[in-house]
């Protein structure tokens, strides 16, 4: 069928099916690649505020512009930031809507994340999210990778600048972020870039040895039981006291 669609799930298990379809259908033309994977649940401000009230946490509301500026400053200051926004991602990769975001310039940030939250093997790398227009400055390849399925070599002169997302072999499994695909996450990274000169953040999934959080309640629960510093859920911010 000429109008077939094989959606990516930001993982490897669907690649064989996609390749098989392409092999068996040489007449496929005008292929359009899915640039985002934001097809999951989304929650209203009212639903989010209701969960925050039920939790008893102190929170503050931010405008969308104030939200990204404040979060970017927190990241630049070394905070571990929970970032819960918009529709949940489809698949096992956090792509900026159910993410924990930190500063990639700190070489100790991998250990901090593993100690406070992830509790995983120290050799496992963490992923960079980078503004799409800056990919060539930091990586040897420039092809878009919006669903974190590509591993590129980090340019040798940039490895010391972003050590927390540079694997021991000099590679990084990156996510390229464009304003068209995820405008809020793009703005967050842009604000971090403005503060630090680095258009990259470390992005890992918002969870602790459980499935990625889906709802505001799950995000709040994960924040409470880990040593995350700040939680941004929708336009609301919660700071650990």
Residue ranges and their predicted role:
Residues 1-3, 11-14, 18, 22-241:
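Flexible beta->alpha loop and helix N-cap segments adjacent to enzyme active/binding sites
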